[in-house]
Amino acid sequence: MSSTTTVAEFAAELNKPTATLIEQLTSAGVAKVQASDHLSEVDKQKLLGYLQASHGTVTAERKKITLVKKSTTEIKQADATGKARTIQVEVRKKRTFVKREDGSDLPAEEVQPEVVAAPQVPVIDDAELIRREEEASRHAELLRRQEAELAEKRRLREELDAKEAARELERQAAAESAKAAAEAAEAAKKAKPVTGKAKEVAQPAGAEASRAAAETAVAEEAAATKAADAAVVQAAAKAKATAEFQADAAKAQDLQERRRKAEAEAAGIRAMMSAPKRVLVPHVDPKAAIKGTLHKPAVAPGAAKPAAAAGAPGAPGAAGKKEVKSENLSSTWKDDAAKKKGIPSRGATAVPGRGNFRSGPRGRRSNDRDARPESTFVAPTEFKVIEVHVPETITVAELAHKMSVKSSEVIKHLMKLGQMVTINQPLDQDTAMIVVEEMGHKAITAALDDPEAFTDDDVQGQQAEALPRAPVVTVMGHVDHGKTSLLDYIRRAKVAAGEAGGITQHIGAYHVETPRGMISFLDTPGHEAFTAMRARGAQATDIVILVVAADDGVMPQTKEAIKHAKAAGVPIVVAINKIDKADANMDRVKGELVTEEVIPEEFGGESPFVGVSARTGEGVDTLLEQVLLQAEVLELRAPVEALAKGLVIEAQLDKGRGPVATVLIQSGTLKTGDVVLAGSTYGRVRAMLDENGKPIKTAGPSIPVEIQGLTEVPQAGDEFMVMTDERRAREIATYRAGKFRNTKLAKQQASKLENMFSDISAGEVKMLPIIIKADVQGSQEALAQSLLKLSTDEVKVQLVYSGVGGISESDVNLAIASKAVLIGFNTRADAQARKQAENNGIDIRYYNIIYDAVDELKAAMSGMLTPDKKEEVIGTAEIRQVFKVSKIGSIAGCMVTAGIVRRTARLRLLRDNVVIFTGELDSLKRFKDDVKEVKESFECGLNIKNYNDIQEGDILEFFEIKEVARTL
C-alpha cells in the first residue's frame, strides 16, 4: 500500500461503503467529502484513534518497565546446637524505568536489595499461619474497639458522678440553712417576757414571731421531704451506677484477658516460625521434688536467695527493726563450727558433759556447753510411701536414692532374697520392682527415656507418594528339596554347586527381571539348625514359595516353614519339585500338606499348587505367574522419594572391607553417602554392591544390596533406617548398645540367683568350652544353637565367645585363658594366631559344613563321658580237693570246667549256687610254676586272698570288669 491512498481505495480495502467511511472520517476530524480525496498516514491514525475511543479498546501506552534481578549466595552460620550450617541467601534487586515525555528512558527508582534468607521449614504451613495472624489481628482490633467504647462509658460515668456530687453539695448547703433557721425560731419561742410592760409591748412581736416560725416549720418539712425523695433517687442511681461499673470492670478484665491471649498466640506463632531445630534435652523427672530441711529450706533453681532476717546494728535499713539477741547470733557460729572437721588428736574424743583430759589450766574443767549438741532426740517420722519409677536396668545406689534410703538397706533386703550384690551392680527391672514392693513402696514401670523418640521425626517429615513395588519372595522348604536349584533355573545361574556340601548355609538375596516384572528372591537354608534365619526370611517377605519334593513329601523343616509363613501372615505358593522323577507322587504330597492346613485352590483353599522341575524347567513359568498374581492381589506399594528403611538380612566381617551387611530395602531409596542406623551400630554408606558384586549408587524398594561403612557388625534381623543427622545416629546407637549391655548384665545376675542351688552339684558336671568364629552372622548363630543343644546332664557345652570374622590373636588368647576349643566355620586363622596356638597347644578346628562340626563335637563330648562298667564272666573252675598249708592257709586244687582262669581276674565263690564270697586270687600255680592263666580242662592250684573257708565241690566263677565307652 502506497503512502497516500484515495478514500474509495481505502473503503474497498476495508470492505466498507464509501459513504460510511467518509462519515467516519468527518466524525474523526478529517475533512474528506469525495471518494477521490487522498488519505495520508496521519489521517488513517486519526481515524484509528477515533474508532478505538468510540469502541472502548484504547490501549494505554506503557510508561514504566520494572526489572528484577536475583543473585544467590551461601553463608555459614552456627545453629542452636553450635554446629555450622550453610544457609542460602537470595538477593533481589528491582529497578524501574519510566518513559518521559521527551522520549528519554530514565530510572525512576531503584529499590534497595532485598535479602531473603533461606526459609525455615515451618511446623505449620504458610496458609494456616497467615490465617491465624489475620484472625489474631482482627481479634486485637475488636478488643481495641471495645476498649475505646469502655473508656467512653467510663468518661460519661465520671461526668455523671461529678454532677451528682455538685447536687449533693447544694442539698447539704440548703439543709444547713434550714437547720439554722429552725434553731433561730426555737430560740425565739423559748424567750419569755421579764416584766408585764415588756410582755404587753412584746405581744404583737410574739404573734408575729410565731407566724414566722410556723412558716419556717412548713418550709423545713417540705425541704426535708424533698431531701428524702432526692436521697432515695440518689441511692437508686448510685446503686445502678455501681452495678454498671462492676459489670464494665468485669467486661474490661475479660477483654483484657482475651487480648492478652490473642497477643500471646500471635507471639507464639511468630516464635514458632523463627524457632531453631529441636535438639535433644536431658529428661527431667517432673515428679522429682526439691527437697530441703527445717533450718535450710529448699530454693528453687533460678530463684534468688532469701535476704537476711535482720541486719547488723548500724547497717543501712536496720533502723526500726527488732534487735537480734546474741544467743541467736552465736547459733550460726555453732553451725559453722560444727561443719568444720575436727583436728585429729591422741586420746578419746571429748564427750559433752564429761570433761576432757586436756582440760583448762590448774585442772579446772572448761565449760563444754558450746560443744554439747542442741538436742540428741530425733522425732520419729511417719512412713511415707513413694512411687518409684523403675527403668529396665537400675543400679543399687540409684534405686536406694529413689526410695530415699541408704544403699545398705537395699543390699540387706537383696541378701534376704538370696542375692549378693554390690552398690554399683545393675539390677533388672523385675528384681528392682520386687525390692521396692518388699520395702513398702509402690513400684511403677518407668517410661523409656531414650533418644529414639526423635527417630520418627525424620520419617514423618518425608511424606512421599507410595508407588507400586516388586514383591519380595522367600523360598523355604526342607533340606535337599531343591530350593536353590529352582532359583538357579530362574536366575539361569549355578549357585548350588558353589555351596559347601551342596546345602545352603546363608540367606541368598537376588532380584530377577522377568518379562512380567521384577521379583526379589530370598533363598533360606533348609537345615534344622537355621531356624532363626528362616524366621528372618519370613519376616521380610511378601510371598512364600514352599518347595516340597514330590518323592520325599512333607518333612520336619517343611512343617516349620509353614509355621513361620503363617506366623508372618504371608500367602503361600506351593512348588512341588522333582516331578520329573519316576517315584514322584503329587497326590501324596497334597494330602500331607492338607494335613498341615495348607489347602490347594482345587480343594477350595487359598494356596496355589504348581508342579515344577528345577532340572528341566517344567512349570517354572506357571510358578512365576502365580507369584505375580498374588503380588497384584496384595497391591504392594512403598514410597520411593523418601529416606530408606529396611531389614538387615545377613552381616559379616570382611578382612579387607570391614563390617559388611546385606540389607533388603523395604521403602525409600538408599544412596551412597547416607547415614545408616542399624540396631546398635551406625555408619555412612561408603559403597553399595548388588547381588552380582557390581557397585551401584542408589537402590529402591524391594532391592537387596550389600553395604559397607558401618562401625560394627550389626545383628542379623535388625531394622535399619537412614538418618539425616550423623550425631543423632551415633547417640541412638550408643544408647542402644549401653542398654543392651545393662540388660544382659542384669539377666546374668538374675540367672546366678536361680542357679545358686544347682551350682552345688556342678562339680560333677564336665564342661567343654568352645569359641566359634564364623563367616556370617546367621551361620554363627545357627552353629552356636546346634552345639549348645548337645549339652547333657554330665557334659555341658560352654559357649565362651562367638563372633564373625577370621580367627585372630585375641581369640587364641581367650582360648588359652578359658582352655577352649577354637572352631572356625568358613574362616581361617592368620599367621600370628596359628603360631600362638601351636606354641600353647590350642586346638583349632576348621569346618565348612555344619553337619561335620556337630558330629565331631558330639564325638569329643562322648569321649568326656564317664564310661559304663560292664562285667564279663571269663571262666569257671570246680574245687576237687582242699589242702591245708601252715602260714598260707587253704589251697584249692581245681579243674577249669569252662573258659579261662586268669591271675588278675576277680572271682565269686558259689556253694549250692549261692554266692558266699567275692574277692581275688593271691596266687595261681600249675604244678610248681606260677602262671598267669589256665585254660579249660586243665588242673591248677590257687589260693584265695584273705579267705580260707572253702570246701570240695564249691564252684569258682571268674569275671573281669570292662569299661564300655558311652555315646551321646
Curated annotation (Swiss-Prot):
It is found in: Cytoplasm. Residues 613-615 are annotated as: G5. GO terms for cellular component: cytosol. GTP binds at residues 477-484, 523-527, 577-580. Residues 468-635 form the tr-type G domain. Residues 577-580 are annotated as: G4. Residues 305-319 have a biased composition (Low complexity). It holds the Pfam family EF-G_D2. Residues 502-506 are annotated as: G2. One of the essential components for the initiation of protein synthesis. Protects formylmethionyl-tRNA from spontaneous hydrolysis and promotes its binding to the 30S ribosomal subunits. Also involved in the hydrolysis of GTP during the formation of the 70S ribosomal complex. NCBIfam families: IF-2 (TIGR00487), small_GTP (TIGR00231). This is Translation initiation factor IF-2. The gene is infB.
